Amino acid sequence: MSHPALTQLRALRYCKEIPALEPQLLDWLLLEDSMTKRFEQQGKTVSVTMIREGFVEQNEIPEELPLLPKESRYWLREILLCADGEPWLAGRTVVPVSTLSGPELALQKLGKTPLGRYLFTSSTLTRDFIEIGRDAGLWGRRSRLRLSGKPLLLTELFLPASPLY
């Protein structure tokens, strides 16, 4: 199963450097804290609509593969993050199987819990980079994060109803 927003997320083209954008846009695109928390600060109830979750092989993650260790399998999670039931963000998380050990096994058991609720409670979370991307007038970003030094890649597409616009 797929969703048009996830297809558009995979079509994002990334800027080589941070573009000169309005401060309000950059505030959203370069946010280093939890996007879930930011959405809740808008006075909204945040929920997750699961699109796809499970193990995939390298051929299913061509966009992410250059940014992650080469492994036989990856945990893929594709969701819509909704505010009061309205989709505001499409998210795609790719986790190398080697990351899924110790406390990070919890990444496979998030279910309808927003990823940010897990990530941003960890004292071992670090971020290698944020890249800004755009496709058909919509903005997105991707970040390589690390939990206990172990990588995962998070890509987010801000949907038209999002307060970013």
From Swiss-Prot:
UniProt binding sites for substrate: M35, R77, L115, E156
Documented EC number(s): 4.1.3.40
Subcellular localization(s) per the UniProt record: Cytoplasm
Keywords assigned by UniProt, alphabetized: Cytoplasm, Lyase, Pyruvate, Ubiquinone biosynthesis
Pathway(s) this gene product operates in, as recorded in its UniProt entry: Cofactor biosynthesis; ubiquinone biosynthesis
Oligomeric form and interacting partners: Monomer.
Protein name according to UniProt: Chorismate pyruvate-lyase
Species: Escherichia coli O157:H7
Gene transcribed to yield this protein: ubiC
